[in-house]
A protein has these predicted regions:
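Acidic/histidine-rich catalytic cores and adjacent linkers
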Residues: 2, 7, 23-54, 58, ...
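Basic, low-complexity intrinsically disordered segments
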Residues: 9-26, 81
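Short alpha-helix plus adjacent loop in nuclease-associated cores
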Residues: 64-85
Length: 191
């Protein structure tokens, strides 16, 4: 891709290591490439090391975010399975709007706009903060997972990237300290 002109440069027949090496062998400036941005597909890392020896391999942040959201969803689903389908907790954890609220970055939520929700069989106006607080009281793991997700997004969305490595180290240590399996696994993808 050409990110500056926003256009696709080429599409390869497959993404196998051999095909990629052959394709990049025609690249004249490959020894002066400084960065390669990609997803976490292992052959991409290997091809980068072989074909762009001076380049730093940068994983697209979207892929990290996906791992973090999957970890949060994993906690939600694990907790949901502990409740009867008719219980309030199960319904709160299953509700698509609530799932969306959990996944959304808190800085992107308009906390003071009422939404209509069913509560105790009646349609009522509720604030997102009230819904979120009710969901997070269901499980300590879910609450801690939510705050780990928020901290992760704080780090990667911050304009100033000073001390980012230290921030990620602290975040990883926090994941390990909280001992939430889904986030321990997700934290292994960082660095």
């Amino acid at each position: 891709n050409d990110p500056i002109h926003r256009r696709v440069l080429d599409i390869l027949p497959n993404r196998k290591k051999e095909c990629l090496i052959q394709y990049y062998s025609y690249c004249k400036n490959r020894h002066s490439v400084e960065f390669v941005i990609s997803d976490m597909y292992e052959p991409y890392l290997l091809v980068t090391q072989i074909m762009f020896p001076k380049a730093k391999y940068v994983v697209d942040r979207f892929h990290y975010i996906t791992y973090i959201m999957d970890a949060l969803d994993g906690i939600r689903i694990r907790q949901q399975k502990e409740y009867n389908e008719k219980s309030r907790e199960y319904k709160l954890l299953k509700n698509k709007k609530n799932v969306s609220l959990l996944r959304k970055y808190s800085n992107d939520i308009d906390w003071w706009v009422y939404t209509k929700r069913y509560k105790n069989g009646h349609m009522v106006d509720v604030l997102p903060i009230d819904v979120l607080n009710e969901i997070l009281t269901i499980s300590q793991d879910l609450k801690e997972g939510y705050y780990l997700k928020e901290k992760f997004l704080d780090i990667i969305r911050h304009d100033e990237m000073m001390n980012v490595e230290e921030q990620f180290d602290n975040w990883i240590n926090n994941c390990i300290e909280k001992n939430i399996p889904e986030f321990i696994e997700a934290s292994k993808t960082i660095f």
